[in-house]
Amino acid sequence: MPMVIHSTSASWGTALKPITNSSSDTITPNPNLITTSRGSSTRPSYITTLTAKKMEQLLPMVINTWNMSEANEMAWRILQQSEGGVRQTRNAVVEGVTRCEELQCFHSVGYGGSPDERGETTLDAMVMDGGLMDVGAVGGLRNIKEAIRVARFVLEHTSHTLLVGQSATDFAVSMGFRTSSLVTPWSHDEWEKWKAKNCQPNCWLNVNPDPKLSCGPYVPKATPLTRWKEDRARNEYEIGENNHDTIGMIAIDVENQIHTGTSTNGMTHKIPGRVGDSPIVGAGSYADNEVGAAVATGDGDVMMRFLPSLLAVEAMRNGKSPQEAAELGIKRIAKYYKDFIGAVIAVNRLGQYAAACYGIPEFPYMISNPTHTVSVQTVKCLPYVHVEPLPKS
């Protein structure tokens, strides 16, 4: 198996310096400025003057989706290997998420969960470097358990962003990873029970025979397509910790170096070949050292259409608070998909964070920083958004 803790190097890019002021406890305004692509600077309206003592309470930090505490604990432990977590953020997200893959968190991460229509489990994962704006990702990875480690190898050993399917497996094998079945007795039993229920629910639309009554095989209907939302509601699928979900993690050191990581085994009973939002840049996660980062979780087929993580980071770039940014990422989706279920966590480069969710009562997430060690926090979800039906064409 390949080495999993890599030595760090200056090639990760020049990190922003810690915000300090030797003459006073009060932070000077300049570090709070965010430089735009044209070189002008604006101070986000939500950032008040922070004291040096307050800054020490925010960074370094690790935050991740859902109540996946052992992943958070592992990442936090790795950040502690250097003062202020410096140069450990990549190791932290990769090994923190790997811990969840090993534990098969809620059967929604790692091997042995979310069987597709053929009973096979496949994995999606991503790592993003917010300094170099570099990404490595895999989608539909077969027969390799360490999905996020393979994504790291894509980042560090190729010029590509995303490798998929059996070819991603072939790449992993060439890099020294070992193959093994991702099917377990539990996942096989779940698949058998699904088939015994006439393959309900499934992901087929506008086909014959009726996918609500049959396992197929299917052929396209000869009639004009109906609007997808009129044909089937998203809430037929129970989305949450146990299905159709992701661990998304953000790590920031005291020099404001940011990495994000994601991993999932995707949607249960998906059509083979389906890739969700987790390995898609701007959907599953996004990071920019100059601004902050965001991760998303939930109904990936819908979420990737809106790039909520990118949307949240760009909102913070334009002066929104982490809370406003996270809510914007959610509300943009709910405007069009009232049955959507999902959540977004947003963190600015100073370590201030917030979460927003929709379609479920509440959303738990994990945080570790100098004042909260492996602490679970919960946010109440946004209320139902009434959407007027679109006029029929």
Swiss-Prot record:
Task: Give the region (Disordered) as residue ranges.
Answer: 15-41
Enzyme nomenclature, EC number: 3.5.1.26
Q: So where's the catalytic machinery, residue-wise?
A: T246 (nucleophile)
The residue stretches assigned to a coiled coil in this entry are none
Which biological processes are named by the entry's GO terms?
A: protein deglycosylation; proteolysis
> Which amino acids does the record list as binding substrate?
R274, V275, G276, D277, T297, G298, D299, G300
Similarity section: Belongs to the Ntn-hydrolase family.
Name of the molecule in the record? Putative N(4)-(beta-N-acetylglucosaminyl)-L-asparaginase GH22932
Species annotation: Drosophila grimshawi (Hawaiian fruit fly)
The taxonomy runs: Eukaryota, Metazoa, Ecdysozoa, Arthropoda, Hexapoda
